[in-house]
Regions:
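Substrate-binding cleft of secreted/luminal carbohydrate-active enzymes
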Residues: 49, 70-138
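General structural signal for secondary-structure boundaries
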Residues: 1, 65, 85-89
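Alpha-helical protein-protein interaction elements
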Residues: 35-37, 52, 121
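Short, acidic/turn-prone active-site loops that include or flank metal/cofactor-
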Residues: 43-48
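Alpha-helical scaffolding within the catalytic cores
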Residues: 22-32, 50-62, 91-95
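Alpha-helical structural signal in soluble globular domains
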Residues: 3-11, 32, 36, 59-63, ...
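Aromatic-lined carbohydrate-recognition surfaces of secreted/lumenal glycan-active proteins
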Residues: 1-28, 39-42, 66-79, 108-113
Length: 138
């Protein structure tokens, strides 16, 4: 990672070095790598872990206090291999919205899947949420 980071420093127009991180990977062992990262895309793999979203974000910030962060928003529970409960989607988006408005994250990434036309509750809620808040500024 250091070699890649150092290489980006030689570019005429330096590109940010971004990494995908899942909440189940939040461990002190990630810290040495994080010093070479500019942007973190933070994701929750298992829908049930959305219940711990606030604690996991605090843990993330204790390990990675100063990196630009995009919060990943899944519309399907990939870890649980099932439809994401709409209540979980509401909780996930409410928390992400608050973090964004407070300046704790730079934005959100909605994982676009082949499920977006399947009339799933979480997907429909996400569509409504994006229509309502998508153009908002801090």
């Amino acid at each position: 990672m250091k070699q890649l980071y150092d290489e980006t420093l030689t570019y005429k127009r330096r590109l940010d070095l971004a990494i995908v991180l899942y909440t189940h990977q939040l461990h002190p062992s990630i810290q040495p790598v994080m010093k070479y990262v500019d942007v973190v895309s933070l994701w929750i793999w298992t829908g049930a872990d959305i219940q711990k979203i606030e604690d996991n974000f605090k843990k993330y910030r204790s390990l990675v206090p100063d990196k630009q962060t995009l919060l990943g928003i899944y519309m399907w529970d990939f870890g649980g291999k099932k439809e994401l409960n709409q209540d979980f989607m509401v909780k996930q988006l409410d928390f992400a919205y608050r973090l964004y408005k407070e300046g704790q994250i730079e934005g959100m990434i909605f994982h676009c899947t082949p499920l977006v036309n399947k009339n799933l509750q979480a997907v429909e809620y996400a569509k409504e949420w994006i229509a309502k808040h998508g153009d908002e500024k801090r």
